């Protein structure tokens, strides 16, 4: 079951059902689907701001591609034998974001929300993460093994100064102190059962 409008679009030999709804209603489903709707209020509020920021960046990116101001992600040649293809929401041409983990998990109202979810959405309404005058592309992963990766190495071939690698249990404000590009060090890290949140 979904809120909002349901629009049907024929694209070639495919029929798309597109759910259109206000951003804040979408976010209630997303933060209830991506994590537990019974999480603490502060965690839900943080997730609402992160998800709202990410969504608005995707919507702007799609609009810029439609207007010809920005191009879609292109493969990056690493060598003659190897290339990297970044799969991003610009792969969507008929809608802003999809309903799966590729974008943000959205399950309509089938995923139960809670009063805390509604309170988190209301308390953070309109709040965004900003870096200078740019809305942050606040992508996230549900698990990182104890060390997050820099944006440019896992999401898109673009440096984002606000999404750097961090160690989960490192003191706040310190840089990662482990070099996981070294195979032996990475293996030791994984086998040590690091604190990962």
Give a label for each model feature.
Residues 1-197:
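Conserved, single-site charged/polar hotspot
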